[in-house]
Amino acid sequence: MLLLQIVVLALIQGITEVLPLSSTGHLALLPLLTPWPSPTTWPDQGVALDVAVHLGTLGAVALYFWRDEAAMIGGCLRLLKGKRDPGARLAFLVVLGTLPAVATVLLLAHFAGPIASPGLATIGWTTLGFGLLLGVIDRLCMTVKRVEHMGGIDCLLIGLAQCLALLPGVSRTGVAMTAARLLGYERVESARFSMLLSIPAIAGAATLVGLDLARVGQSAMAPAALIAAVTAFLAAFLAVAAMMAWLRRHGFGPFVAYRVLLGAALLALAYLGPDLAPFLVS
């Protein structure tokens, strides 16, 4: 891959992995809007770059929420000494919220086998539909709860909602934030818990892809992987910081509007044909 392609892919995946957007939608649209050397020959990023981007994004989220992570680690250590601690409770919630997605992935891997690549129309409809759902719920639902108020039922419901992200175009962070807002959690708290849930989710994805890398071996990709990891780290960190700052004073409106536009673009390409791509980039 060209250096510019690596940077563009890392930027897109780093940003869309943490924002309530659709990484699948962007990656589906990318080959049509950036014809290097032609829309039909956009290269596969490869396993090594996939691992690198996941690790870069994971590092960004872990760095931004280091206080929560320190509290969870310290709380678990104090719990081992017989002392109850809010940090240990938060760690329990993160583990509990992750279990539905883990169970779903294992069940699908065992019973369903490989899943066919989705079409543009599917990605477009899910990007658009779940974006509108986030907008409606964000506007209509209460804003009273914090993560400290979260019980096991709410946590499991948010975790179950994450399973919908297995549908391409849904966005894991987006659907988790939507579920949290539906349950009455503050915007910042919804984003915060979604980001904490993303740590085991991204780590798990990186581990699975890393196992593939260990089997096939791509050591020659080390310089490119380093560039991808650093780019994804910077993009994800800035994206998380900007989102959290925005949500302290505003709602999810800009993210909803962007998803509607992205979904509309994907649907236009799906139903009117890729011949529209030159008009979108001109």
UniProtKB/Swiss-Prot annotation:
Gene Ontology annotations of biological process type: cell wall organization; peptidoglycan biosynthetic process; regulation of cell shape; response to antibiotic
Primary location recorded for the protein, binned into one broad class: membrane
Membrane topology classification: Multi-pass membrane protein
Transmembrane segments annotated in the record for this chain: 1-21, 46-66, 91-111, 117-137, 150-170, 193-213, 226-246, 260-280
Protein's cellular compartments: Cell inner membrane
Catalytic activity field: di-trans,octa-cis-undecaprenyl diphosphate + H2O = di-trans,octa-cis-undecaprenyl phosphate + phosphate + H(+)
Keyword annotations of the record: Antibiotic resistance, Cell inner membrane, Cell membrane, Cell shape, Cell wall biogenesis/degradation, Hydrolase, Membrane, Peptidoglycan synthesis, Transmembrane, Transmembrane helix
UniProt-listed Pfam families: BacA
Annotated GO MF terms: undecaprenyl-diphosphatase activity
Assigned GO CC terms: plasma membrane
Family from the record: Belongs to the UppP family.
Function: Catalyzes the dephosphorylation of undecaprenyl diphosphate (UPP). Confers resistance to bacitracin.
Further remarks about this protein from its record: Bacitracin is thought to be involved in the inhibition of peptidoglycan synthesis by sequestering undecaprenyl diphosphate, thereby reducing the pool of lipid carrier available.
Name listed for the protein in its UniProt record: Undecaprenyl-diphosphatase 1
